[in-house]
Amino acid sequence: MNNLNLIPVIPEIFLAAATCAILLIDLFLSDAKRYLTYVLSLATLVVCAVLSLSDFNAGATSYSFGNMFVSDPMSNLLKFCTYIAVGLTLVYSRQYLEDRQMVNGRLGGEFYILSLFTVLGQMVMMSANNFLIIYLGLEIMSLSLYALVAFRRDNAVAIEAAMKYFVLGALASGFLLYGISMLYGATGSLDLTEVARVIATGAVNKPVLIFGLVFVVAGLAFKLGAVPFHMWVPDVYQGAPTAVTLMLGGAPKLAAFAITIRLLVEALPALAIDWQQMLTILSVLSMAIGNITAIMQTNIKRMLAYSTISQVGFILLGLLSGVVAGADGSTTNGYGAAMFYVITYVLTTLGMFGVIMLLSRAGFEADNIDDFKGLNQRSPWFAFVTLLLMFSLAGVPPVVGFYAKLAVLQAVLSTGQIWLAVVAVLFSLIGAFYYLRVVKVMYFDEPADKAKIVASKDVTVTLSINGAALLALGLVPGPLMTACAAAIIKTLAS
């Protein structure tokens, strides 16, 4: 059906128009009025959030542009979380960017504008129902992120990180595109629904399909940062400005999760046994190498990079534990648990990098674990918030990270893969060491600098709400879990 129904695309159209308008406005702003670009960017995200939330509450699935674009419960919920993630990133980053002259002078408001273009790419990825639309969204997001990583053109470390990210990112895009070309050659269609239908008939070349699947999974693993396609993650996290690291480590994970569902679960359900085996290997390797390597790190950004790799292993556990069109609740347990996990992980990561930027100041980067020494003496409240963040990453109750891990483990056990659940628990216990080491440093070590921490009101309030949200979701995880499960079920049923 060739339809040009623009209603499902209203959030994307608004964001694209607003971003272009902000870009033009920023050209005429003096440095003293650059704050307006920041405010307009946040306002744009708020409007987009209202639009996507209203679509989510409607619960309907609608298509546009000849079924190439879909607005469904999963995409709308993930978009809403993306707006929150990027909005928090902008709030946490504002003072950090101003201290380093990154939002004035010749750079202007480019950080905010590139951030909005990143969001646009993620939105397109989440709503893509066509191979080429997925690739289009991926490139919009990736090109914006490449520019953000290289934002500090006078910083050799940042430029090196940008080069690594660009080269490996281009390689990942090539893998994904080559895999898509194989799938297109085997099925004769770029439409995800049609690809699934053709494969289900059995009238396809199975070796070509498997060959294409391998490249698609490799490309997705690059974007997620799963082992053995994780080489870029530690160097880019450490080398990029902390504000950019947060932009990299937050919302893009939501988009990567979305296209994984689109490509594997929606387009290739007939090959579930094959890609679930691949994800099992990626998951175990990611949890093993991520957790073990993180123990040896003294740079907290690098430690969080390896932590991200291990957390991706848990997300993959949920994805490989879902049963396509299962009537026994396994779909809910697997894909819903993975979605719940990635949302809560992103929320936790935002807060942690927010604390790092809070401790940083002009001419000083709080990149090392030693910079957290005695934080409880300098600011008991921020130390407590960091404690909640670390407990969530480690999976310590009653913070939400515990229930996210528990939901994934329950999904794994429901499929009978007891050995996989045992491996996940063992590596989680190993991972708890380096998270709790930061807590020990904050509460039991003496600070090198005993000056009290002074934070702006917006950062103080936002970081406090972030920490409180993790605790509240841990005490009452039901509503978000139910929303994730319902979104997945409705999306896969449509």
UniProtKB/Swiss-Prot annotation:
One GO CC term on file: plasma membrane
Bilayer-spanning residue ranges: 9-29, 36-56, 73-93, 107-127, 131-151, 166-186, 209-229, 241-261, 278-298, 304-324, 339-359, 382-402, 416-436, 469-489
Membrane topology: Multi-pass membrane protein
Keywords from the named record: Cell inner membrane, Cell membrane, Membrane, NAD, Quinone, Translocase, Transmembrane, Transmembrane helix, Transport, Ubiquinone
GO BP: ATP synthesis coupled electron transport
Subcellular location as annotated: Cell inner membrane
Pfam families from the UniProt entry: Proton_antipo_M (PF00361)
Reactions it catalyzes: a quinone + NADH + 5 H(+)(in) = a quinol + NAD(+) + 4 H(+)(out)
InterPro entries per the UniProt record, alphabetical: NADH-Q_OxRdtase_suN/2 (IPR010096), ND/Mrp_TM (IPR001750)
Keyword Cell membrane: yes
EC number annotated for this UniProt entry: 7.1.1.-
Top-rank taxon, per record: Bacteria
GO MF terms, alphabetically ordered: NADH dehydrogenase (ubiquinone) activity; NADH:ubiquinone reductase (non-electrogenic) activity; quinone binding
UniProt family annotation: Belongs to the complex I subunit 2 family.
Stated role: NDH-1 shuttles electrons from NADH, via FMN and iron-sulfur (Fe-S) centers, to quinones in the respiratory chain. The immediate electron acceptor for the enzyme in this species is believed to be ubiquinone. Couples the redox reaction to proton translocation (for every two electrons transferred, four hydrogen ions are translocated across the cytoplasmic membrane), and thus conserves the redox energy in a proton gradient.
Quaternary structure and interacting proteins, as annotated: NDH-1 is composed of 14 different subunits. Subunits NuoA, H, J, K, L, M, N constitute the membrane sector of the complex.
Protein name: NADH-quinone oxidoreductase subunit N
Species for this entry: Herminiimonas arsenicoxydans
